[in-house]
Design a protein with these regions (language model features):
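Acidic, glycine-rich A-domain
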Residues: 1-183
């Protein structure tokens, strides 16, 4: 059995374009997983300075305001994992979408929570919504946290979502490797 956590930043810095890119990525990932696997438990988390779990029908409609504290999303994933999806019984996959903004004083807490996720997750993916002209892509603090996890575990990846077309490139990049290994 597998659980797939979809966590999304819905803070003020995530504009409509950013949210649409993230939601499109998540929507197609969910559809693809449902076609490929019989037993997938999707979990949907959205956050600003706090994090909440949502039913799928509400997750794709959620918007928020305020600042960004990424560690709250990671802590919510850890909480749900502990309460409902024992990592010894479930393969766990985590996908996080953000524009990369995060309160500076949250860096250590976000790094610690992400490291805890890295201890049990089969794979952790990060998509960063970015403008096409943003240089360098994936140059944010949040992207660097995922780069560090990727270097430490080899079971993480990052991808910049810049256009609707890049959603498919991200899906191919993430699923070429982890899903083959999990099968």
């Amino acid at each position: 059995e597998a659980v797939v956590y979809f966590a999304m930043d819905v803070s003020s810095s995530m504009g409509e374009r950013d949210r649409q890119l993230a939601k499109t990525f998540f929507f197609w990932v969910v559809q693809g997983l449902r076609r490929q696997y019989l037993h997938i438990e999707p979990v949907f988390v959205a956050h600003t300075i706090e994090a909440w779990e949502f039913p799928e029908s509400e997750f794709f409609q959620v918007t928020g305001s305020g600042g960004t504290v990424a560690s709250t999303a990671f802590q919510k994933v850890l909480e749900i994992s502990t309460q409902r999806f024992d990592p010894s019984r479930f393969n766990s996959y985590v996908f996080y979408a953000s524009d990369g903004a995060n309160f500076q004083n949250d860096r250590d807490a976000a790094a610690a929570a992400l490291a805890e996720i890295g201890k049990f997750a089969n794979y952790v993916g990060y998509v960063e919504t970015a403008a096409e002209q943003q240089q360098p892509p994936l140059g944010t603090e949040t992207a660097m946290l995922f780069e560090q996890l990727e270097a430490e575990t080899g079971l993480a990846g990052r991808y910049a979502l810049t256009t609707p077309e890049s959603v498919w490139d991200a899906i191919r990049a993430f699923f070429a490797r982890p899903m083959e290994e999990a099968a």
